[in-house]
């Protein structure tokens, strides 16, 4: 199993979730986060915004589904041409074990 963390722009999170659900990947966890990447925030006039609002999605999937999920997120979350700074990041981690609390059982 893999755990995919996707940091996307807030205005893209609904579209990403819908595309994932339409492809059969409806289970995810979402929360609001703030941070900055290479651009270190933005400056508007004299105001400097060090951190930008983003949404983080967490998706646990089978190894075989990882590439399709990543492709869906990248295609849906991109706001313009390739290389547009600030569109987000995707991180993939291995999942060693998973448990369902209600049944107190280890998942396969």
Task: Outline where the language-model segments fall.
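Positively charged, small/polar-rich N-terminal and surface patches that mediate targeting and assembly
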Residues: 1-108
């Amino acid at each position: 199993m893999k755990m995919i963390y996707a940091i996307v722009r807030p205005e893209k999170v609904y579209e990403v979730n819908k595309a994932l659900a339409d492809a059969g990947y409806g289970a995810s966890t979402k929360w609001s986060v703030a941070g900055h990447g290479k651009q270190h925030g933005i400056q508007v006039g004299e105001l400097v915004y060090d951190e930008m609002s983003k949404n983080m999605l967490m998706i646990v999937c089978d190894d075989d589904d990882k590439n399709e999920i990543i492709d869906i997120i990248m295609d849906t979350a991109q706001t313009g041409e390739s290389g547009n700074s600030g569109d987000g990041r995707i991180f993939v981690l291995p999942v060693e074990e998973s448990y369902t609390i209600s049944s107190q059982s280890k998942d396969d």
